[in-house]
Design a protein with these regions (language model features):
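Hydrophobic residues at beta-strand termini and immediately following loops
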Residues: 88, 245, 286
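Bacterial N-terminal signal peptides
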Residues: 17-31
Length: 349
């Protein structure tokens, strides 16, 4: 009998601990499920860590699996760096499932109204005006933008389109918006594959001039290797700061030698933008950024550092900050038609 109170006490202790864990898990899940009902994810940092900055990450590409990479980046930004994040997806309105091949619907863009940063990795989207207006208003306000990989050709409107935002299309050649969103805002539109797509990777080489100038975005970043190939660039980027050059590699592994027959191309840069009637804003663009590319720690650090820089927190960038994925991250190889079918936003919590 003398041992029963101790046993009861231990059982009570662990029961209370389990109830607390269950409650916290339920509370965290509930906040995200509420967001998921509207087809996007919403992550909030702990109060002690919060930066007071909101970031909207926009996926929606058919090939490079941004529906995998952006939730991972959002969790790093929230749990490791104190940013509040929203992750948006291409959603099929009939199934309510994530469908990168459905090009006309990305719910949740209204979250840009009070966001501090937009990170976009979309490809060839033809969004309705009621969604595009939120992107346009964000840019008119001169707020910062980070473009990843296919964001250079994020939008595509056919010639017969009646959209008020047709000029965002990657092939536009009219007025100020030559090259559309990519050409006018990010610095380049879609040109070509400079490297051999699917057989050559990219070695990202730091620009020594920018390192010498102590560019905060490059703090702690070393050479990057990714399996996606180098994109071609035609724009001189004369008003940009080139941070990283990409050299094609003869193979799809980090040990592959460089292809000395091919020139280097800019693969990461910063610049300013200003749309007609809008305020001036700043941009970080990298043509790297498939989901499998983000297995490279240095690329993750580059993007996290760029996020700090974009929202004016460059003085808080640390060379050894934690940029490890939160939980398991097992991206699949890029390719058309390879996305995992039947997924909902909540599946990427």
């Amino acid at each position: 009998m003398t041992h029963q109170p101790r046993t009861t006490s231990i059982l009570s202790f662990w029961t209370n601990k389990l109830l607390l864990i269950a409650f916290l898990s339920f509370s965290f899940g509930l906040s995200n499920c509420i967001a998921q009902q509207n087809n996007w994810l919403h992550f909030t940092p702990e109060k002690a860590q919060a930066k007071g900055k909101k970031v909207v990450l926009i996926s929606g590409d058919e090939e490079y699996r941004s529906e995998e990479s952006l939730p991972m980046l959002a969790k790093i930004l929230t749990q490791k760096h104190g940013f509040e994040t929203f992750v948006l997806f291409a959603i099929n309105p009939e199934t309510k499932q994530i469908d990168p091949e459905y090009q006309k619907n990305i719910p949740g863009l209204e979250n840009l109204q009070n966001a501090d940063l937009m990170i976009i990795a979309s490809r060839f989207r033809e969004l309705p005006d009621e969604q595009m207006k939120h992107v346009d208003n964000f840019l008119k306000a001169g707020k910062p933008v980070i473009g990843l990989r296919t964001a250079t050709h994020a939008f595509n409107f056919p010639k017969e389109s009646k959209s008020a935002y047709k000029h965002y299309g990657f092939s536009n050649q009219e007025g100020d918006w030559k090259g559309g969103f990519g050409g006018f805002i990010l610095g380049e539109t879609w040109i070509n594959h400079h490297g051999d797509h699917g057989t050559e990777g990219s070695l990202g080489l730091m620009n020594g001039l920018q390192i010498n100038a102590k560019n905060p975005i490059l703090l702690g970043v070393e050479d990057i290797w990714v399996p996606s190939d180098v994109y071609g660039i035609k724009n001189s980027l004369k008003n940009s700061e080139i941070l990283v050059f990409g050299q094609p590699t003869l193979g799809m592994t980090a040990e592959s030698p460089i292809n000395r027959k091919k020139s280097i191309m800019p693969v990461a840069w910063t610049k300013d933008y200003q749309i007609p009637g809008g305020k001036k804003g700043k941009v970080f663009t990298t043509t790297m950024g498939s989901s499998i590319d983000l297995l490279d720690k240095n690329l993750r650090r580059l993007i996290v550092n760029a996020s700090y820089w974009a929202v004016g927190l460059e003085n808080e960038i640390k060379a050894d900050s934690n940029v490890d994925p939160v939980g398991e991250f097992k991206p699949i190889m890029f390719g058309f038609g390879t996305h995992v079918k039947g997924k909902y936003p909540k599946d990427y919590l």
